[in-house]
Amino acid sequence: DSALQELSAILDGMHVSEKEISSGVIKVPKYRSLYIDNSLKDSDMIKVDRDSSFKDIIRGIRNVKDSDFAVPPALKSTLRNYQKTGFRWMKTMAAYGFSGILADDMGIGKTLQVITLLEDERLQCKDSLSLVVCPSSLILNWQSEIEKFSKTLTSIIISGSSDERKVQI
């Protein structure tokens, strides 16, 4: 039966055990939501009920541009539209408890997008602390960009040998 083969392939892709299948309860991590939705959306043979939280995750991730996450006022006019979308994507990932990698061509503003995220986190929680880990060749650039674009963030560079870093910390 092709429906069973299709379902078996999906369950294999999610590494669902026979024990879970036998129990009738399959718990799937949130990060698999898109995989499940994509695997099942075109299937006429498999009936799946999606609860409201599942639908919310899918809707949120698929409609990042339309999210309610507002760019901090101090940076709103600085960011280009694609950078605002990048900021909203990072906020969406964080809202659902996901991680992500912001990657694109070099020189189109990832640092500024992350500074915008950090600025927003600071506005939401004054006591928030963040750690940026970057190649030593970019440390001064990060500090310069923070000073240039943020009035609320402060930065401290911790670099040097292991012993020097221990003293700085």
Model-found features: residue ranges?
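Charged, low-complexity
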Residues: 1-100, 148, 153
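Conserved G/P- and acidic residue-centered "switch" motifs that form tight phosphate/ATP-binding loops
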Residues: 83, 107, 132
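Walker A/P-loop NTP-binding motif
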Residues: 88-96, 111-126
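Short hydrophobic/aromatic beta-strand immediately N-terminal to the Walker A/P-loop
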Residues: 100-103, 131
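Phosphate-binding Walker
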Residues: 105, 112-115, 137
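Hydrophobic residues on the short alpha-helix immediately C-terminal to a glycine-rich phosphate/catalytic loop
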Residues: 105, 117-121, 142
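Short, glycine/charged-enriched secondary-structure capping and boundary segments
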Residues: 108, 115-117, 145-149
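SF2 helicase/translocase NTPase motor core
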Residues: 122-169
